[in-house]
Amino acid sequence: MASKESKPSRTTWRDMEPPLRETWNQVLQELVKRQQQEEEEQQGLVSGLQASKADQIYTGNSGDRSTGGIGGKTKKKRGWYKWLRKLRAREKNIPSQFYPDMESNMVGMENLTLETQLEDNALYNPATHIGDMAMDGREWMEWRESAQKEKRKGGLSGQRTNAYPGK
C-alpha cells in the first residue's frame, strides 16, 4: 500500500509553484499583451459606433484579410471583396436618422401627389383613348410604307444598294 503514502498527482504544494520572479514576468507579459490589444482595437474601431472587434470597420489596409502566396485569391476577387467590405463599412456608419421609423408619420410623404399637369395629361387617363385605339389597318400600312419609302430614297449614301434588289 505504498500508493496511499505517496501524494496524488493532482494536489499542489508550495514547492511546485514557480519562484516569485517568474510569475511577475508572466504578469508583465500579460499586461503588455493586453495593452497592445486595446490599442489595436482603438485604432481599428471608430469610437462610439462599434463596440466589438467583430464590427470592425475596414481601415484601408490593402493586405487585410487576403491570403498571400500559392492558393491565394486572385487580384480581381480580392479587389471585389475589398470593395464589398468598404461598402458594408459605409453602411454601418449611416446614422439612425437615415433609417426612419416606418410606423411614425414621415413628414412630407402625405403631401406627395401627382402634379395637376400630369393628372390632366391624356396619357395618364386610359379611358380617353379606348375608342381611338382601333385604327384602320390600311391607314397604318399606308403611313408605314410611305415612311419607309422616304427612308429608302435617302438611303445610306449608296452603301446598301443591293439590300432591296426588287425595288
Swiss-Prot record:
**GO biological process, alphabetically ordered:** mRNA transport
Is this entry keyworded Transport?
yes
Coiled-coil region(s) at which residues? 21-45
Compositional bias (Polar residues) at which positions? 158-167
Q: Primary place of residence?
A: host cell
Q: Which UniProt keywords apply?
A: Coiled coil, Host cytoplasm, Host nucleus, mRNA transport, RNA-binding, Transport
What are the subcellular locations of this protein? Host nucleus, Host nucleolus; Host cytoplasm
The ranges of region (Disordered) come to 1-20, 33-75, 142-167
Domain of life from the UniProt record: Viruses
UniProt GO MF annotations: RNA binding
Q: Where is this motif: Nuclear localization signal and RNA-binding (RRE)?
A: 75-92
Per the annotation, the residue ranges of the short sequence motif Nuclear export signal are 106-115
Question: Could you state one GO cellular component term attached to this entry?
Answer: host cell nucleolus
Q: What does this protein do?
A: Escorts unspliced or incompletely spliced viral pre-mRNAs (late transcripts) out of the nucleus of infected cells. These pre-mRNAs carry a recognition sequence called Rev responsive element (RRE) located in the env gene, that is not present in fully spliced viral mRNAs (early transcripts). This function is essential since most viral proteins are translated from unspliced or partially spliced pre-mRNAs which cannot exit the nucleus by the pathway used by fully processed cellular mRNAs.
Q: Describe its assembly.
A: Homomultimer; when bound to the RRE. Multimeric assembly is essential for activity.
UniProt domain comment? The RNA-binding motif binds to the RRE present in incompletely spliced viral pre-mRNAs. This region also contains the NLS which mediates nuclear localization. These overlapping functions prevent Rev bound to RRE from undesirable return to the nucleus. When Rev binds the RRE, the NLS becomes masked while the NES remains accessible.
> What name goes with this protein?
Protein Rev
Instruction: Read off the lineage from the record.
Output: Viruses, Riboviria, Pararnavirae, Artverviricota, Revtraviricetes
